[in-house]
Amino acid sequence: MEAPVVNVGIMTEKAVSFVFHGEYVHTETGKFLTGEQRALFVNGNIVYNGRLFKEIFFEPASPSSSFELKAVTIGRNFHWQRQEDQCFKGAFNLVTGENGIVVINQVDVEEYLTSVISSEMSAQASKELLKAHAVISRSWLLAQIEKNFRLGRKEEKQQNCYRDNEQLIRWYDREDHNIFDVCADDHCQRYQGITRASNPIVQEVIHETRGEILVNGETICDARFSKCCGGVTEQFEPPFLPDSIEGQSGNNFSGPHSGRRGPEMDSLCS
């Protein structure tokens, strides 16, 4: 069975510089292209090779072809925001947006996940961690695609709030993207190209978990995850934690292996 295709929004800029590694086909003209390319946003149009477009679609001529985007902003609005060049597989198109040219990568889900699990954490992480990450990320992604398909067919909006007598749950930014499925930055999932997937284990992980998702009955779980670079976990009931745990000296987590191993528990994902 073929994997579903996902449309990933990579960047929006007034000028987009990119390089074709291998041949790509400009579907409107049928021309085969390779090497350095550049497109500009002028008066609501895309200027490319001396012509005006509202949308341009490029298809790889070979599965081995890839394209490189120059100066992609990652970590947008975070303290570590920076720009870097990134390489991608699959097709891509340039679309006019309100603020510039929107670059969208069209790629199959499994190829997308190869980059995600290498970009969110590290391609050098343990195999079992990467397998769990692949299942969670695949579930979240397919839940978004399913939602977009459903909303595209019906006059309805995604439920953003759930309330009962005990709690109020609110989701933010669920309908931020209307011309692609997900974006490539922390707002959705980090998708930073094929260069980070350098460890052969990443390919093994995607192959071994291919098609595996989390479901609740007949519904794909909107399996959101969070991560941080430090701190100590705690039950969700306490609204905050004091600076130090009263009456305890606390554990020493200064070293890479200094955390105490807790009691074994059954796996939540298998």
Residue ranges and their predicted role:
Residues M1-S270:
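Conserved, single-site charged/polar hotspot
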